[in-house]
């Protein structure tokens, strides 16, 4: 497997970002682009000492590095990308491992993977996450809550939100289970909550004759078997590179039996339908309610989407999705293209500006998360 210079690796990252087919099969049909996807495969795994689970759960993260700051940051080298995409796995018994990865590119024939190698904080402010009129919608009634796409949103026992992305897998934000130094309290016994009717008769008690009242719901919990967190988050906590990797995957102990939403590579903001994104989460100012919102993307970098969707702590970890045309299957399909991370106050031309931020699923992140889910890179060739 021949190595290539680091400059060529940077060129590959750029090609992954822009080297795609035209996103429109017709002016009124925004279409999922086709990307040339890399492969991220484990190279070696070593055991680590058990963590102390001493961190306090953070329902949001903040950063002073805004769009212009991030745009001025150089793309990672091959060695840096390998370091950031290496990951820790935490198991239900408290043990953990660290896995180093290699980055590959599929050969044009599709018969195998070619290795690509090389030669070698802000001012504190009160956080405001509601912009003008509160445009969030609380979702009521089992006919909505238990149906797609709202049924893909789940609650973490640490207080965040997650999204079902496979039969046994939940995508969420890394800061919901790890503060960048160690795992948060309760992560060893992490559970995922699924909304279901509180009563078997359809949502109301036997003595409740008020048909206009919404059905009462409760959470049914499933334990988590293991979690994956990228080292880019763990090693990046001292600076703003960590926010680019604020995502984690949870594997449940048993299948959830609900329809899930697939992940996809995030298209450029200008190719999103209406330039908008959507997500649903369990904002902590509306306890027990699933809250849906949509809004325009205001800015973007290679790794982040900046928007002003109304949100509160607790919504962190929500899957950011869009609905676009799938040319191969000739149908519309929603996909998760990012993970809602948190809130930022940044300096914009000398004036403070606040944003809510989502981590984009880039081609490399897609390859990593897909491998965590599938365990076979050949099943991860369509982003």
Swiss-Prot record:
It is found in: Secreted. Residues 1-19 form the signal peptide. It comes from the Eukaryota. Pfam families: Trypsin (PF00089). Disulfide bonds join 160-176. InterPro entries: Glutamyl_endopeptidase, Peptidase_S1_PA, Peptidase_S1_PA_chymotrypsin, Trypsin_dom, TRYPSIN_HIS. Belongs to the peptidase S1 family. This is Serine protease 23. It comes from Macaca mulatta (Rhesus macaque).
């Amino acid at each position: 497997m021949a190595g290539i210079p680091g400059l060529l690796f940077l060129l590959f990252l750029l090609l992954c970002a822009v080297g795609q087919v035209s996103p429109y099969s017709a002016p009124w049909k925004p279409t999922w682009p086709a990307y040339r996807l890399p492969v991220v495969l484990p190279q070696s795994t070593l055991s680590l000492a058990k963590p102390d689970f001493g961190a306090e759960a953070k329902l949001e993260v903040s950063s002073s590095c805004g769009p212009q700051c991030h745009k001025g940051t150089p793309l990672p080298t091959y060695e840096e990308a390998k370091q950031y995409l290496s990951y820790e796995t935490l198991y239900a018994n408290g043990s953990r491992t660290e896995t180093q990865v290699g980055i590959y590119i599929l050969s044009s024939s599709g018969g195998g993977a070619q290795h690509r190698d090389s030669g070698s904080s802000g001012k504190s402010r009160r956080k405001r996450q509601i912009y003008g009129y509160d445009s969030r919608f609380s979702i009521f009634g089992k006919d909505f809550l238990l149906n797609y796409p709202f049924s893909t949103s789940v609650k973490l026992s640490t207080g965040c939100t997650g999204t079902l992305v496979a039969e046994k897998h939940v995508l969420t934000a890394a800061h919901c289970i790890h503060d960048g130094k160690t795992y948060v309290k309760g992560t060893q016994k992490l559970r995922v909550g699924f909304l279901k009717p509180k009563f078997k008769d359809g949502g109301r008690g036997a003595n409740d004759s008020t048909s206009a009242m919404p059905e009462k719901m409760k959470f049914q919990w499933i334990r988590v078997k293991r979690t994956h967190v990228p080292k880019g988050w763990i090693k990046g906590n001292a600076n703003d590179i960590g926010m680019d990797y604020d995502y984690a995957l949870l594997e449940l102990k048993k299948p959830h039996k609900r329809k899930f939403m697939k992940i996809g590579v995030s298209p450029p903001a200008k190719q999103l339908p209406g330039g908008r994104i959507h997500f649903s989460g369990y904002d902590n100012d509306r306890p027990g309610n699933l809250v849906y919102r949509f809004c325009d993307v205001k800015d973007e970098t290679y790794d982040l989407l900046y928007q002003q969707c109304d949100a509160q702590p607790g919504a962190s970890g929500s899957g950011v999705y869009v609905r676009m045309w799938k040319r191969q299957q000739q149908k519309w399909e929603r996909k998760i293209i990012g993970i809602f991370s948190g809130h930022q106050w940044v300096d914009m031309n000398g004036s403070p500006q606040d944003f809510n931020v989502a981590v984009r699923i880039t081609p490399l992140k897609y390859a990593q998360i897909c491998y965590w889910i599938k365990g076979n890179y050949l099943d991860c060739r369509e982003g």
